[in-house]
C-alpha cells in the first residue's frame, strides 16, 4: 500500500456521473473530480522546531479538495491522487 510522507494524503477520487438534472456527461465534458475518500495519511507536517503537527483527516474520511490539486499516481492497477493537506477544503459528513 502507498504510505505518504509528511503532510501528504492519498485519496481515491470519486467521479460524478451525472449533472444535477440527471444528464449523463460525455467523458471529455467532465470536470476533474473534487471529492474523494482518504485512503492513507502521512505523519504530518514538521515545523522548524522539529515538532510534528498531525494531519487533520483520517482514513475513510470523505473530503473536498481543490480542483487542480495533487498528482495522479497509479498503484496496483488503481488510480489515486496524492495531495498536500493544504489542498483539502473540507470533510464531508
From Swiss-Prot:
PROSITE patterns (alphabetical): CHAPERONINS_CPN10
Alphabetic keyword roster: Chaperone, Cytoplasm
Entry superkingdom: Bacteria
One GO term describing the cellular component: cytoplasm
InterPro entries: Chaperonin_GroES, Chaperonin_GroES_sf, Chaprnonin_Cpn10_CS, GroES-like_sf
Keyword Metal-binding included in the entry's annotation: no
The UniProt record lists the keyword Repeat: no
Subcellular location(s) per record: Cytoplasm
Any GO BP: chaperone cofactor-dependent protein refolding
GO molecular function, one term: protein-folding chaperone binding
Function noted in UniProt: Together with the chaperonin GroEL, plays an essential role in assisting protein folding. The GroEL-GroES system forms a nano-cage that allows encapsulation of the non-native substrate proteins and provides a physical environment optimized to promote and accelerate protein folding. GroES binds to the apical surface of the GroEL ring, thereby capping the opening of the GroEL channel.
Entry's family note: Belongs to the GroES chaperonin family.
Summary of subunit composition and partner proteins: Heptamer of 7 subunits arranged in a ring. Interacts with the chaperonin GroEL.
Protein known as: Co-chaperonin GroES
Protein source organism: Limosilactobacillus fermentum (strain NBRC 3956 / LMG 18251) (Lactobacillus fermentum)
Amino acid at each position: 500500500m502507498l504510505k505518504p510522507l509528511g503532510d501528504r494524503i492519498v485519496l481515491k477520487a470519486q467521479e460524478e456521473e451525472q449533472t444535477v438534472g440527471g444528464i449523463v456527461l460525455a467523458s471529455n465534458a467532465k470536470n476533474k473530480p473534487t471529492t474523494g475518500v482518504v485512503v492513507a495519511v502521512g505523519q504530518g507536517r514538521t515545523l522548524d522546531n522539529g515538532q510534528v503537527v498531525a494531519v487533520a483527516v483520517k482514513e475513510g474520511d470523505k473530503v473536498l479538495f481543490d480542483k487542480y490539486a495533487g498528482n495522479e499516481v497509479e498503484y496496483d492497477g488503481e488510480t489515486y491522487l496524492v495531495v498536500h493537506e493544504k489542498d483539502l477544503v473540507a470533510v464531508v459528513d
